[in-house]
């Protein structure tokens, strides 16, 4: 009787369990993820892997074992895309990378760089507090800033490596003025901050003149020696560095312990023609139209056709970094031939005259900077028309166009 009662007590559980069992259960079909097609862009920047790799190796060969290399990749690698450039530096065993903002610090570390990571400008207190996560060597040029960084380091129980910037080059930007007792005393106090470690002393050249470089170098050598003495630091324990791209190529004695170079990696230097350009700015023809002599072109009718003309519509404008200064002044390359920009550059459109060309069709490649066939739009041409440094333009183009690694 008791056994029957026990089974009756379990009956509700059997019923519930049975009700929970699937009937004619069919497992869901495996969902196959659809591959999304790549977005087709109206314009893009090609970054030549082979040219970049060539330039890096050439700099390394130039320096040999006489000095170390810090690759400056600030400004999103001068507009060339840090995420594309940094891995090539890592592949070439570059030991030091210089950047500016915390996003760049994070990106370089996330890409797997394990070497020295240096900030090459003064940082805000908020930046410095966060940057301790990335094991960065901060640039310090005044006592107050050093004290604030020391407090951050103490709060986080860390010792932060720093590079003391001197104003030896006369930039009057980041550096500590040490040509007087007050400046030397500040340098001494910086060295005594318990949570900072001086690992480098640096300065910067404000102009590209070999004789001026030598003058500034002599001043830096003298001042850095004085600073080392008041700080009580061993010379072999501190990296001295001042050379930029121009100084590195033209004044070898400026190399010291390390050089900081950036533009040279992209072929952007007046000091040598031995380095290759890395960037090409491209688009395609959207449409072709025929217009009679006397028609005007673009906003404000700034150009009047002098003949019956064939005009190509290129989907690039100042929204893509092709500024209005190129209106009626710039050129593009189509089929290896130079063609003039007519009228004012619109936000999203440029018109070029292809009347003299044959067999041109929509979809054909257009180059606004770089080489196509035997023709080239040079950096000097871009600078002459725009009134801007080419670096300004490359950073602008990089910020407004997709960058793709080629060859």
Swiss-Prot record:
Result, substituting residue 74 to L: Completely loss of racemase activity towards lysine
Consequence of substituting residue 394 to C/N/T/Y: Arginine racemization activity is increased by 1.5-1.8 fold compared to the wild-type enzyme, while activity towards L-lysine is decreased. Almost no change in affinity for L-lysine and L-arginine
Record-listed substrate binding positions: 173, 347
Function: Amino-acid racemase that catalyzes the interconversion of L-lysine and D-lysine. To a lesser extent, is also able to interconvert arginine enantiomers. Cannot use methionine, asparagine, alanine, leucine, glutamine, phenylalanine and histidine as substrates.
Lipid attachment points (S-diacylglycerol cysteine): 19
Oligomer status and interactors: Forms a head-to-tail homodimer in the structure.
Domain of life the protein comes from: Bacteria
GO MF term list: alanine racemase activity; arginine racemase activity; lysine racemase activity; pyridoxal phosphate binding
Signal peptide per UniProt: 1-18
CDD domains: PLPDE_III_AR2
GO cellular component, one term: periplasmic space
Membrane topology: Lipid-anchor
PANTHER family named among the record's database cross-references: ALANINE RACEMASE, ALANINE RACEMASE, CATABOLIC-RELATED
The encoding gene: lyr
EC category: isomerase
SUPFAM superfamilies the UniProt entry points to: Alanine racemase C-terminal domain-like, PLP-binding barrel
Residues of the active site: 74, 299
Record bears the keyword Disulfide bond: yes
Sequence positions bearing N6-(pyridoxal phosphate)lysine: 74
Family label: Belongs to the alanine racemase family. Bsr subfamily.
EC number: 5.1.1.5
Thermal response of activity: Optimum temperature is 50 degrees Celsius. More than 78% of maximal activity is observed at 40 degrees Celsius and 60 degrees Celsius.
Note: The active-site cleft is located at the dimeric interface and contains the two conserved catalytic residues, a lysine from one subunit and a tyrosine from the other subunit.
Subcellular location: Cell membrane; Periplasm
Inhibition and activation profile: The racemization activity of Lyr is completely inhibited by hydroxylamine.
Protein name: Lysine racemase
Keywords: Cell membrane, Disulfide bond, Isomerase, Lipoprotein, Membrane, Palmitate, Periplasm, Pyridoxal phosphate, Signal
């Amino acid at each position: 009787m008791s056994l029957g009662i026990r089974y009756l007590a379990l009956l509700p559980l059997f019923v519930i369990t049975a009700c929970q069992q699937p009937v004619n259960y069919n497992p869901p079909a495996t969902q196959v993820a659809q591959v999304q097609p790549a977005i087709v862009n109206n314009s893009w920047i090609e970054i030549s892997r082979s040219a970049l790799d060539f330039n890096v190796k050439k700099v390394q060969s130039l320096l040999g074992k006489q000095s170390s290399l810090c690759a400056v990749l600030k400004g999103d690698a001068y507009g060339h895309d840090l995420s594309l450039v940094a891995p090539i530096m890592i592949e070439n065993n570059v030991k030091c990378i210089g950047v500016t903002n915390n996003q760049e610090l994070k990106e370089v570390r996330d890409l797997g760089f394990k070497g020295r990571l240096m900030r090459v400008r003064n940082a805000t207190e908020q930046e410095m507090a966060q940057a301790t996560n990335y094991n960065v060597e901060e640039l310090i040029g005044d006592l107050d800033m050093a004290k604030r960084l020391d407090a951050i380091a103490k709060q986080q129980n860390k010792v932060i490596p720093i590079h003391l910037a001197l104003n030896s080059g006369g930039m009057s930007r980041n550096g500590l003025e040490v040509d007087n007792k007050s400046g030397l005393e500040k340098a001494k106090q910086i060295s005594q901050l318990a949570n900072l470690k001086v690992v480098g002393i640096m300065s910067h050249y404000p102009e590209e003149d070999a004789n001026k470089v030598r003058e500034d170098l002599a001043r830096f050598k003298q001042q850095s020696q004085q600073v080392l003495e008041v700080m009580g630091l061993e010379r072999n324990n501190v990296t001295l560095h001042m050379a930029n791209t121009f100084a590195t190529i033209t004044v070898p004695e400026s190399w010291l312990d390390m050089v900081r170079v950036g533009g040279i990696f992209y072929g952007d230097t007046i000091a040598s023609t031995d380095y290759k350009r890395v960037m090409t700015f491209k688009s395609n023809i959207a449409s072709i139209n025929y217009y009679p002599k006397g028609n005007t072109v673009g906003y404000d009718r700034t150009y009047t056709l002098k003949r019956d003309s064939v005009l190509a519509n290129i989907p690039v404008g100042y929204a893509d970094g092709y500024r209005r200064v190129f209106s009626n002044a710039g050129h593009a390359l189509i089929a290896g031939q130079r063609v003039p920009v007519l009228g004012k550059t619109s936000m999203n459109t440029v018109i070029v005259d292809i009347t003299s060309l044959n067999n041109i069709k929509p979809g054909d490649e257009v180059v606004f900077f770089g080489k196509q066939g035997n023709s080239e739009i040079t950096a000097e041409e871009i600078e002459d028309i725009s009134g801007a440094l080419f670096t300004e333009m490359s950073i602008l183009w990089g910020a407004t166009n997709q960058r793709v690694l080629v060859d």
